């Protein structure tokens, strides 16, 4: 099994919606998936039909001294969700007060991996490098750095470090945009970790969260859903390739 982290090169690039879409695609392919919201924004739940007023989550449980496992939610027989949980206004203003407590989730994720219960654990990671985020990134077997083809992300790709071994996944690529086409050609020549898969702009991606469903469940026939399914297959092949390479060293 593998722990896969998805993190935006900046905020607002669609990481959360992509995480939900990839989790759905992997379970469509027969994989057992746990998707974990690692962001204090607590938005991943909104892609899995969780009531807006639901405040529970693994972080909320740890802060309240409760068992984080009770915060897990079943979406399908092969897809489970672990929301972050809602922080209070005071907690949001003082993140340093809870970073250490929430660090306990690291050992929990390692135990889940060792149990073999899930084929994949997907982490929806927030942008930035807080102590908690750095800890979770270090647990990942693979990391996808989500980027949009714009000047903002172009600059960031040259001035901020990506997680070790991360692959860059382009999201929201617009057909007919001269600027995006020019930058994309530059990235093809300069970004050695660029994935050979692109997620194009698709209205279904915006609509699915409004419908509180993962992309592939909401519109399986959409272009973006088909591209995410291709991404899921790439993840399976890439993970299998890593295991084969590791085995050949013995």
Curated annotation (Swiss-Prot):
Cellular component, GO annotation: cytoplasmic side of plasma membrane; cytosol
Residues holding ATP: 9-16
Pfam families listed in its UniProt record: CBP_BcsQ
Localization per record: Cytoplasm
Keyword Nucleotide-binding: yes
An MF annotation (GO) of this entry: ATP hydrolysis activity
The keyword Nucleotide-binding is assigned to this record: yes
Domain of life: Bacteria
UniProtKB keywords: ATP-binding, Cytoplasm, Nucleotide-binding
Family note: Belongs to the BcsQ family.
Function: Essential for cellulose biosynthesis. May play a role in subcellular localization of an active cellulose biosynthesis apparatus at the bacterial cell pole.
Name under which the protein is recorded: Cellulose biosynthesis protein BcsQ
Organism listed in the record: Salmonella typhimurium (strain LT2 / SGSC1412 / ATCC 700720)
């Amino acid at each position: 099994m593998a722990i896969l982290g998805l993190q935006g090169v900046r905020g607002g690039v669609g990481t959360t919606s992509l995480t939900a879409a990839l989790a759905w695609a992997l379970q469509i392919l027969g994989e057992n998936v746990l998707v974990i919201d690692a962001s204090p924004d607590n938005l991943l739940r909104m892609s899995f039909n969780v009531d807006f007023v639901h405040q529970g989550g693994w972080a909320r449980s740890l802060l309240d001294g409760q068992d984080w496992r009770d915060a897990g939610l079943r979406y399908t027989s092969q897809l489970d969700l672990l929301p972050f949980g809602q922080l209070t206004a005071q907690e949001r203003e003082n993140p340093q007060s809870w970073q250490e407590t929430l660090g306990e989730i690291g050992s929990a994720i390692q135990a889940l991996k060792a149990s073999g219960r899930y084929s994949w654990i997907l982490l929806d990671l927030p942008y930035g490098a807080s102590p908690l985020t750095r800890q979770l990134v270090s647990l990942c077997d693979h990391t996808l750095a989500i980027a949009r083809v714009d000047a903002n992300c172009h600059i960031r790709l040259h001035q901020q470090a990506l997680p070790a071994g991360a692959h860059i996944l382009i999201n929201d690529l617009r057909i007919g945009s001269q600027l995006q086409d020019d930058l994309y050609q530059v990235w093809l020549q300069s970004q050695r970790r660029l994935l050979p898969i692109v997620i194009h702009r698709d209205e279904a991606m915006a609509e699915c969260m409004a419908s509180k469903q993962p992309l592939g469940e909401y519109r399986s026939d959409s272009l973006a859903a088909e591209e995410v399914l291709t991404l899921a297959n790439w993840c399976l092949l890439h993970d299998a390739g890593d295991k084969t390479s590791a085995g050949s060293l013995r």
